[in-house]
């Protein structure tokens, strides 16, 4: 039995890099893992760890809601949320266009706040949980 045996863990940005490593580590510790990513390669990661994959554009509020609701149903519970997904602004402050900057804010700031609220509601059903925010852009 691992440290997170039977616990439901949601990981955003789980297709590669830090997110993939986080999802793999939780799975090794017995967690039930659901990961989301814009990239379809996340499906391979989920299959390799026995988890669930959701292709999600975190800029879209409805997709965030769908992810948490469907992941909670698939796992049976939510105990941990890891807000790992992030995007970088294309270019410098002198060249970035306002719509691009708004997307960065939506994905990097609004989405983690919204996902945290959604996941916290699920965590209350099981007596609590943990939310981890990762601040890294690859």
Residue ranges of predicted features:
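Residue(s) in the substrate-gating loop at a strand-loop-helix junction
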Residues: 136
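A short, exposed helix-loop element centered on a Lys and neighboring polar residues
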Residues: 116-117
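A conserved hydrophobic alpha-helix of the Rossmann-fold in NAD(P)-dependent oxidoreductases
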Residues: 42-43, 63-71
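Substrate-binding pocket helix/loop in short-chain dehydrogenase/reductase
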Residues: 92-93, 100-105
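Conserved NAD(P)H cofactor-binding loop of Rossmann-fold oxidoreductase domains
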Residues: 84-89
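Canonical Rossmann dinucleotide-binding motif of NAD(H)/NADP(H)-dependent dehydrogenases/reductases
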Residues: 2-34
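The beta1-alpha1 cofactor-binding region of Rossmann-like NAD(H)/NADP(H)-dependent oxidoreductases
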Residues: 56-67, 98
């Amino acid at each position: 039995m691992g440290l997170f045996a039977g616990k439901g863990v949601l990981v955003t940005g789980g297709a590669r890099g830090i997110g993939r490593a986080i999802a793999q580590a939780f799975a090794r510790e017995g967690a039930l893992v659901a990961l989301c990513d814009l990239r379809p390669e996340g499906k391979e990661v989920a299959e390799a760890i026995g988890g669930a994959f959701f292709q999600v554009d975190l800029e879209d509020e409805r997709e965030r809601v769908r992810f948490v609701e469907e992941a909670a149903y698939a796992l049976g519970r939510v105990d941990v949320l890891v807000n790992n997904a992030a995007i970088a602004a294309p270019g410098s402050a002198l060249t970035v266009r306002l719509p691009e900057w708004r997307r960065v804010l939506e994905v990097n700031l609004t989405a983690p706040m919204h996902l945290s609220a959604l996941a916290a509601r699920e965590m209350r059903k099981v007596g609590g949980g943990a939310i981890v925010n990762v601040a890294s852009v690859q």
